[in-house]
Amino acid sequence: MILQQPLERGPPSRDPRATTGVTRGLNASLSPREPLHKQFLSEENMATHFSRLSLHNDHPYCSPPVTFPEALPPLRSPCPELLLWRYPGSLIPEALRLLRLGDTPSPYYPASPAGDIVEL
């Protein structure tokens, strides 16, 4: 069984609706202090719940999506240049060794002269 709302601890209080004769209906709004009843989870209840779900995006289960402003402006003319990159994890111990020796490390990829552009 699942509790819908935690029960309050403390001295018992009288329900003001008990003296006025108001009964709790299915659509009546509940006060935040009033504990809710336990729900019995049966196979039929679960089958009913899952049969109402949909795999398609035609049922709004939550609020409408929020659109955020673009983080970057859209590219006006995309560039077809290729960037070669290697994970530097294996180069870190070598760089530390060279720093201890006082040497300047040579770049792994030699710099290409300006004007050499690789296009796809």
UniProtKB/Swiss-Prot annotation:
Annotated spans, Disordered: 1-30
Nucleus in keyword set: yes
Residue numbers spanned by region Interaction with HCFC1: 58-61
Motif (Nuclear export signal): 92-101
Keyword Ligase: no
Pfam families: HPIP
InterPro entries: HCFC1R1
Keywords: Cytoplasm, Nucleus
Top-level taxonomic group: Eukaryota
Cell compartments where the protein resides: Cytoplasm; Nucleus
Gene Ontology cellular component list: cytoplasm; nucleoplasm
Bias-annotated ranges (Polar residues): 20-30
Known role: Regulates HCFC1 activity by modulating its subcellular localization. Overexpression of HCFC1R1 leads to accumulation of HCFC1 in the cytoplasm. HCFC1R1-mediated export may provide the pool of cytoplasmic HCFC1 required for import of virion-derived VP16 into the nucleus.
Quaternary structure and interacting proteins, as annotated: Interacts with HCFC1.
Name of the protein in its database record: Host cell factor C1 regulator 1
Organism encoding this protein: Mus musculus
